[in-house]
Amino acid sequence: MSRIAKYPVELPKGVEASIQPDQITVKGPLGILVQSLTGDVNVAQEDGKLTFVVANDSRHANAMSGTLRALVANMVTGVSKGFERKLNLVGVGYRAQIQGDAVKLQLGFSHDVVHQLPAGVKAECPTQTEIVIKGPNKQVVGQVAAEIRKYREPEPYKGKGVRYADERVVIKETKKK
């Protein structure tokens, strides 16, 4: 059995999990998330905890039990607390603002970049150079942050661009004569 899958996932108050043969659904105050199940892992719910047991002794089933446990733990955290990713815009004239369910970015191009947000993901701009992306699904929040960062990645000489708040950009030295 996987070392990660040995530990059960505790369900906090206000979070419910329903298990069908082919999927698990987690409901909480921030939304509903669904994860498909494989036949290699059996999921059981008892006393407010979810346990993951390997159905057969293959290496694939062992790996899937740990993966599934981590995904379900992220689902439980997502529907109870949520996930967020912070982005900083570094550069002269770089700005962001929220327009409905889209983020409008001014990144030094001749045009503004408008990024549509998927369902379930919210964004806010505490300042013109900060974007906070929030949502219950960790994968989708990270994907949206990566897509926004991709419009103008930090360049290595001045560090201008869109970067994660916890990202450290290594600045190169310019060529000397």
Curated annotation (Swiss-Prot):
Domain of life according to the entry: Bacteria
A single GO molecular function term of this UniProt record: rRNA binding
KW Membrane (keyword) present: no
Annotated keywords: Ribonucleoprotein, Ribosomal protein, RNA-binding, rRNA-binding
Ranges in a coiled coil: none
Alphabetical list of Pfam families matching this protein: Ribosomal_L6
Gene Ontology CC annotation, any one: cytosolic large ribosomal subunit
InterPro entries: Ribosomal_uL6-like (IPR000702), Ribosomal_uL6-like_a/b-dom_sf (IPR036789), Ribosomal_uL6_a/b-dom (IPR020040), Ribosomal_uL6_bac-type (IPR019906), Ribosomal_uL6_CS (IPR002358)
Any single biological process term in GO: cytoplasmic translation
Family: Belongs to the universal ribosomal protein uL6 family.
Function, in words: This protein binds to the 23S rRNA, and is important in its secondary structure. It is located near the subunit interface in the base of the L7/L12 stalk, and near the tRNA binding site of the peptidyltransferase center.
Oligomeric and partner information: Part of the 50S ribosomal subunit.
NCBIfam families: L6_bact
Protein name: Large ribosomal subunit protein uL6
